[in-house]
Amino acid sequence: MTFIKEFRNKGYFHQCTNLDRLTSITKETKIAAYIGFDCTATSLHIGSLMQIMILRLLQQHGHKPIVIIGGGTSKIGDPTWKDEARKILSKEEIAKNAEGIKKSLSKFIKFGEESSDAIMLDNSEWLDSLNYLDFLRDFGSYFSVNRMLTMDSVRLRLEREQHLSFLEFNYMLLQAYDFYYLSKYYNCSLQLGGSDQWGNIVIGVDLIRKISSKEVFGMTTPLLTTSSGAKMGKTAAGAVWLNEDLLSPYDYYQYWRNCEDADVIRFAKLFSELNTKEFTKFENLVAEDINAAKKQLAYELTKLCHSEQAAKSALETAVKIFEQGEIDENLHTVVLELEILQAGINAYELFHEAGLATSKSEARKLIRGKGAKINDKLIEDENMIINTNFLLDKSVIKLSAGKKRHILVRI
């Protein structure tokens, strides 16, 4: 199967500047392609996982992945498409974050000196020495403001009469220059990114075409959300990091184990390397099999990110907590902010918050009547303080009201 065919089959494709030509070229020869990552944390999280799997797919097909971290652009902060500009990072913070990002990526792709080995570059290498007057003289005439004003990210802001800063325009130019630089010095012919990057990518493609007449391409992926519309990468308890110093392999396993039923097949295609036979099995699932599929998905993705031993350990821990400990993972779940447990909460208040009592007085009555349990142990005192010490494997608390009503409290 060709790179482009597998790219589309797995659900990665959204747009391409010239798909037919790119398909032909990637069949005939090996190319270099790049993806850029924010340099704002010491680890990537699962919001970047589709892009990482694309780099892995590139490498598996013999193409060369180039990873760009925005050390240069991080020094001026991200463009303000959001309500609040991101913190401007120091050189030391950027270097530390870059090291962590490479650790995340090294779980999935190989860095080295071979033709298809990945390389990581920091755009500060060329942007720091870029003279503004020279840049305007050498490149300014190639950028069309008319064209830039038609980009969705700009057009929508103007239509809404929202502030549009000069920095945002400059950021587009710097990203275009990144592509030009990589094309010239690293023979990079493809830029990949999320669909929100389409305008910036096209500007880079146009710049290279006008200056050097080189044939380069841009291709984007769909923005990824869960089936309920939630953004990938974060939960109520925080980001789902790829590096184990920020999130344990068990918690990583549990994130995928608890994904929505409607997402299992899609996530398996996007993020796993299960074969066609396994996909077919997933697609023909009946309701009672969905939990087995979730376990397999969680196992495969944990193995890919951490190791097979880490996946086995996570599975064993889950069995110990939820099966041998008679806690069913499929119980109704409520989410509680970690800060509340860290401060401590009265037992009767927790039962009320969790929905096991319609009022605090009813919760008190439940406890006094010996009908309330926490982690299958009877609660004797309605004022008992529940805190993080009650968390099972740092993630859940089981509450029971009587014999038939049970809830899992997750942080």
From Swiss-Prot:
Q: What is this protein called?
A: Tyrosine--tRNA ligase
One GO cellular component assignment for this chain's record is: cytosol
Span(s) of short sequence motif 'KMSKS' region:
231-235
Q: Which species does this protein come from? A: Rickettsia canadensis (strain McKiel)
Q: What's an example Gene Ontology biological process for this entry?
A: tyrosyl-tRNA aminoacylation
User: Where on the tree of life does the source sit, at the highest rank?
Assistant: Bacteria
> Where on this chain is 'HIGH' region (motif)?
39-48
Q: What enzyme class is recorded for this protein?
A: ligase
Q: Which residues form a coiled coil?
A: none
Q: Where does ATP bind?
A: K234
The molecular function terms of the Gene Ontology recorded here are: ATP binding; RNA binding; tyrosine-tRNA ligase activity
The job of this chain, per UniProt, is described as: Catalyzes the attachment of tyrosine to tRNA(Tyr) in a two-step reaction: tyrosine is first activated by ATP to form Tyr-AMP and then transferred to the acceptor end of tRNA(Tyr).
Protein keywords: Aminoacyl-tRNA synthetase, ATP-binding, Cytoplasm, Ligase, Nucleotide-binding, Protein biosynthesis, RNA-binding
- Intracellular or extracellular location(s): Cytoplasm
Catalysed reaction(s)? tRNA(Tyr) + L-tyrosine + ATP = L-tyrosyl-tRNA(Tyr) + AMP + diphosphate + H(+)
Ranges of residues in domain S4 RNA-binding: 345-411
E.C. code: 6.1.1.1
| Pfam families for this protein | tRNA-synt_1b
Q: Where does L-tyrosine bind?
A: Y34, Y171, Q175
State if Aminoacyl-tRNA synthetase is listed as a keyword: yes
Which family is this protein grouped under? Belongs to the class-I aminoacyl-tRNA synthetase family. TyrS type 1 subfamily.
